[in-house]
C-alpha cells in the first residue's frame, strides 16, 4: 500500500508539472511579436532555414509590386453606405514590404492596395488607395492584412521601398506628365469617398500566396500570386461598407520592367542619331544663302522646342529614378545635342539668310537683333511649359498642335513660291522619327510608363503627319503652288517673255561669259525685270545661290 501511495504521489506530481509546463509555453506564445524570443520548439516546428532553402517551409520574399484584378462576389455592390461603388470589377495594384520578426515563420507586412475603376465616370476621382498592415505566415503561405490606422510607421520600410522602386517612381512621373496634374489629383482626393471609407470601415484581407514560374526575356523568374478575399465590416453598425470582393494579383518582375525602360532609352538615342544625320543632309542641301532663305524659321524653331522639352523630360525622369539615371541621361544628352548644336545652328543660318543686309549697320545692331531672336525663342519655350502645366488635361490636343511643324513650311512655300526648299529624305526621315516616341507612349500596350494606349489617337496622329509630309512632297515634285487654283494666285513674272526678234545681235552672258544667240528657242534664255539676258541654266543655278541680278544686283522675283 505504501508503494502504491508513493507511486500515486509521484504520478500526481508529474501530471501537475506537465500541466504547469504546458501553460508556461502557451503564455510564452502570447507575448508580443517584437518581444518574443526564438525558442527551440519554434525552430523545430518551422525549420531552422528561414532564408533560402528549397524545402516545403522555405521563406519567400513577397516584397514587391503586384498587379491584378478585383471583383465583387455578388453581381453588384449591395451596400447602402457606399452606393457609389457600382462597378462589378476593375484593376488593382498591391504594394507590399515585409520585414522579419522575432517569431520564426512570421513576417511583418506594410503596404497599400490601390483599386482602379471603382467609381462611375461621373465622379472622376481616380483610384481608391488604402494603406494596410499585417502579418505573413510564410510556412503556411498565409497573408493577413487590415487597414492601417493612419499613424506613421517607425520603420519607414514602405517609404524606402517606394522611393527605390523604378516601377512606382516612373508611374508617378508618367501620371504627372501624361495623365493628371498634382493640383487636380489633390482636388479629387478631397472629394473622394475613400476618406469616408477609412473613417467608417474596417478593412480585412485574407489571402493565400502561391508561386509560379515565368519565362520572360529568355529567363525563368519566380513570380508570386496573391488570391484572397477582402471584407469591410462597418465600425458603428452591422451594415457592411460594401460587399466582399475577391483579389487576384501577380508580382511584377522589376528586372523586366527595368529592361523595358533601358530599351526605350536606346530607341530614343538611335532616333536622335538618325535625326542628326537627317539635319546634316538638309543643311548640305540648303548650304547657300538662297537655299537657307527658303526654309521656314518657324518650322525649325518648333522642332527645336520639341527636342528641348524631350531633353528636359528625360533628364527629369533620370533624376527621379536613380537606378535608371545613366540610361535616361544618355537619351537626354543626345536630345540636347540635336537641339543645341544642330537645330540652333541651322536656325541662326536661316535667320542670317532671311535678314535684309544693309551696308552701313554695325555690330551693335546685329547683336541687338540676335538677342531679340534668342529672347523670343526662350520666351516661347518657357511659356509653353506654363501653358502645358495649366492645360494638363488637354495634353493630347497640345501634342497634335506641336506635331504640326510642317505647316509653316507649307505656307511659306505657297507665299514665297519657293522651289525645293527641303530634301525629300529630310521630309520622310523626320516624319518617321518624330512619330517614334508618341507612338510608343500612346500606342504600345505594355509601355513602361503605364499610359493607357489609344489606337484612335495614334492613327489620327499618323494620318495628320502623313498628310503634311505628302503635301510637302507634292510641292517638291510638282511646284509649290500646284494645289492652289490659278485664279487665286497673284500674277507671276515670266522670265521667258518674248523678245524683239528684229534685234539680230548677240549678247554675252555675264555668268558663263559666252555668247547668247537670241535667234534660238525662247526657252534657252531668261530675261530679268531689269532687262538683262542670261542663259536659262546659268541664271537658275545663280538664283539657287542668290536672288540678285548678276549684273546690277537688284532683287529678283521667284522663278
From Swiss-Prot:
Q: Does the keyword Metal-binding apply?
A: yes
TM segment ranges: 260-280, 295-315, 319-339, 371-391, 395-415, 424-444, 459-479
Q: Name one GO cellular component term.
A: membrane
Q: How does it sit in the membrane?
A: Multi-pass membrane protein
The molecule here is called: Transmembrane E3 ubiquitin-protein ligase FLY2
Tissue specificity, please? Highly expressed in stems. Expressed in root xylem and seed coat.
Organism source for this protein? Arabidopsis thaliana
Question: One Pfam match, by short name?
Answer: DUF2921
Q: Which GO BP terms sit in this record?
A: plant-type cell wall modification; protein ubiquitination
Q: Which domain of life is it from?
A: Eukaryota
Catalysed conversion reaction: S-ubiquitinyl-[E2 ubiquitin-conjugating enzyme]-L-cysteine + [acceptor protein]-L-lysine = [E2 ubiquitin-conjugating enzyme]-L-cysteine + N(6)-ubiquitinyl-[acceptor protein]-L-lysine
Q: Which SMART domains match?
A: RING
Q: Which CDD domains match?
A: RING-H2_TUL1-like (cd23117)
Using the record, list the residue span of the signal peptide; answer none if the entry has no such feature: 1-29
Q: What is its EC number?
A: 2.3.2.27
Kindly list the places in or outside the cell where this protein is found, as annotated in its UniProt entry. Endomembrane system
Function noted in UniProt: E3 ubiquitin-protein ligase that may be involved in xylem development.
* Pathway of action: Protein modification; protein ubiquitination
A GO molecular function term, named singly, is: zinc ion binding
Amino acid at each position: 500500500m505504501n508503494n502504491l501511495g508513493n507511486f500515486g504521489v509521484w504520478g500526481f506530481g508529474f501530471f501537475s508539472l506537465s500541466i504547469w509546463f504546458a501553460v508556461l509555453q502557451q503564455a510564452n506564445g502570447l507575448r508580443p511579436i517584437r518581444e518574443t524570443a526564438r525558442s527551440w520548439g519554434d525552430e523545430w516546428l518551422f525549420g531552422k532555414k528561414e532564408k533560402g532553402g528549397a524545402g516545403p517551409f522555405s521563406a519567400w520574399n513577397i516584397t514587391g509590386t503586384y498587379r491584378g484584378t478585383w471583383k465583387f462576389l455578388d453581381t453588384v455592390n449591395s451596400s447602402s453606405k457606399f452606393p457609389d461603388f457600382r462597378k462589378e470589377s476593375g484593376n488593382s495594384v498591391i504594394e507590399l514590404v515585409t520585414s522579419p520578426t522575432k517569431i520564426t515563420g512570421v513576417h511583418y507586412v506594410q503596404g497599400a492596395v490601390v483599386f482602379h475603376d471603382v467609381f462611375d465616370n461621373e465622379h472622376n476621382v481616380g483610384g481608391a488607395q488604402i494603406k494596410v498592415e499585417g502579418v505573413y505566415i510564410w510556412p503556411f503561405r498565409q497573408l493577413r492584412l487590415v487597414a492601417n490606422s493612419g499613424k506613421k510607421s517607425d520603420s519607414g520600410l514602405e517609404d524606402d521601398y517606394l522611393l527605390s522602386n523604378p516601377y512606382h517612381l516612373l508611374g508617378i512621373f508618367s501620371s504627372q506628365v501624361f495623365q493628371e496634374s498634382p493640383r487636380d489629383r489633390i482636388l479629387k482626393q478631397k472629394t473622394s469617398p475613400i476618406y469616408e471609407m477609412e473613417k467608417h470601415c474596417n478593412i480585412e484581407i485574407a489571402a493565400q500566396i502561391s508561386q509560379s514560374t515565368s519565362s520572360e526575356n529568355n529567363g525563368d523568374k519566380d513570380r508570386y500570386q496573391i488570391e484572397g478575399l477582402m471584407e469591410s465590416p462597418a465600425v458603428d453598425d452591422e451594415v457592411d461598407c460594401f460587399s466582399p470582393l475577391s483579389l487576384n494579383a501577380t508580382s511584377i518582375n522589376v528586372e523586366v520592367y527595368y529592361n523595358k525602360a533601358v530599351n526605350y532609352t536606346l530607341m530614343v538615342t538611335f532616333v536622335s542619331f538618325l535625326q542628326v544625320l537627317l539635319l546634316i543632309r538638309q543643311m548640305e542641301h540648303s548650304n547657300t544663302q538662297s537655299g537657307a532663305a527658303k526654309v521656314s524659321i518657324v518650322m525649325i524653331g518648333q522642332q527645336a522646342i520639341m527636342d528641348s522639352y524631350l531633353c528636359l523630360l528625360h533628364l527629369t525622369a533620370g533624376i527621379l529614378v536613380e537606378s535608371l539615371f545613366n540610361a535616361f541621361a544618355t537619351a537626354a544628352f543626345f536630345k540636347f545635342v540635336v537641339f543645341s548644336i544642330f537645330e540652333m545652328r541651322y536656325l541662326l543660318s536661316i535667320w542670317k539668310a532671311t535678314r535684309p543686309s544693309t551696308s552701313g549697320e554695325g555690330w551693335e545692331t546685329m547683336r541687338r537683333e540676335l538677342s531679340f531672336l534668342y529672347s523670343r525663342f526662350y520666351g516661347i519655350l518657357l511659356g509653353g511649359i506654363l501653358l502645358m502645366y495649366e492645360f494638363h488635361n488637354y495634353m493630347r490636343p497640345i501634342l497634335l498642335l506641336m506635331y504640326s511643324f510642317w505647316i509653316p513650311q507649307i505656307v511659306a512655300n505657297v507665299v514665297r513660291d519657293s522651289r525645293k526648299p527641303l530634301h525629300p529624305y529630310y521630309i520622310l526621315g523626320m516624319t518617321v522619327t518624330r512619330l517614334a516616341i508618341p507612338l510608343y507612349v500612346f500606342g504600345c500596350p505594355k509601355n513602361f510608363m503605364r499610359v493607357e494606349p489609344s489606337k484612335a489617337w495614334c492613327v489620327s496622329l499618323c494620318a495628320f503627319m502623313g498628310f503634311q509630309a505628302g503635301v510637302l512632297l507634292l510641292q517638291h515634285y510638282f511646284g509649290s503652288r500646284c494645289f492652289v487654283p490659278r485664279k487665286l494666285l497673284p500674277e507671276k513674272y515670266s522670265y521667258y517673255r518674248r523678245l524683239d526678234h528684229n534685234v539680230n545681235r548677240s549678247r554675252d552672258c555675264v555668268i558663263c561669259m559666252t555668247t547668247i544667240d537670241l535667234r534660238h528657242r525662247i526657252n534657252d534664255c531668261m530675261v530679268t525685270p531689269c532687262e538683262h539676258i542670261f542663259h536659262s541654266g546659268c541664271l537658275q543655278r545663280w538664283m539657287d545661290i542668290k536672288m540678285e541680278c548678276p549684273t546690277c544686283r537688284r532683287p529678283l522675283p521667284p522663278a
